[in-house]
Amino acid sequence: MLITETFHDVQTSYGTTLRIYVYSPKIAGYPQAKFPGVILYSEIYQVTGPVRRFGQRIASEGYVVVAPAIYHNFMGPEALPYDVQGTDIGNEYKIKKPLESYDEDNKLCCDLLFQLPQFDGKRIGSTGMCLGGHLAFRALLDKRVTCATCFFPTDIHSRTLGLGQNDNSLERVSKELGNNQEMVLIFGTADTHVDPQGRDLIRKTLRDHGVKFTFLEILAAQHAFIRDEFSKGRFDSAITQSCLGFLFEQFNRKLRIDLGEFVDDNTPLEHVC
């Protein structure tokens, strides 16, 4: 499926301009075609080449993808380089940006989708990697977001996102998710940013609160395994392709199909071989 690319500059309550990149499917002969929406959150480097290609990949499957440049509080929409200086700047901004500003970014992305003529006006999914995985997780606090696929989300277990480094993402998401919302969380067992104890904390908290989720720990996969350049030796194409299967299964089921109202079926499952 062909795609088109553009961007929208949106004013925030912080007196800044949020640039939101838009990747849309294009089907020859069907200029009025409409598609579900996806919010794509980047790493600490803003919308880099790997993030852009990830957005294009999702759009090519028939989704309108919006990708915000999240550091509008401090800089323009340009991407930070994958070097020491870019990493230091990205990590600095990550904990200087108010949590409320992250949430406003998410609201503005949802609002923009509903203004786009190619959006079907129904359901939205979210995804992202690293910092973006956390933001995709937190995006579920907006009930317009039906599902999320979060790649190696950082800082959820440590509660260190945003100004003051004291976020409430895990607590709020685990308590506030609706029956029609769900998520996929994907980590590598060799991820040095989210240790086994941190992964266990996330999984147990979600399970204890009855959240609908899939939790993957991929043997030997490292942090940033989805980044197809400047990954510092961690990119794994085969694992990335496998994980996209989970993403598209969730998006196709939750965003494309009209499931109707949720009905809680407590019928015990039959124990069969």
From Swiss-Prot:
InterPro entries assigned: AB_hydrolase_fold (IPR029058), Dienelactn_hydro (IPR002925)
Keywords from the named record: Hydrolase
GO CC terms, sorted: cytoplasm; mitochondrion
Catalytic activity: 2-(5-oxo-2,5-dihydrofuran-2-ylidene)acetate + H2O = 4-oxohex-2-enedioate + H(+)
EC identifiers of the protein: 3.1.1.45
Active site positions, chain numbering: C130, D191, H223
GO MF entries: carboxymethylenebutenolidase activity
Family recorded in the similarity comment: Belongs to the dienelactone hydrolase family.
Name of the protein this chain belongs to: Putative carboxymethylenebutenolidase
Species of origin: Saccharomyces cerevisiae (strain ATCC 204508 / S288c) (Baker's yeast)
Higher taxonomy: Eukaryota, Fungi, Dikarya, Ascomycota, Saccharomycotina
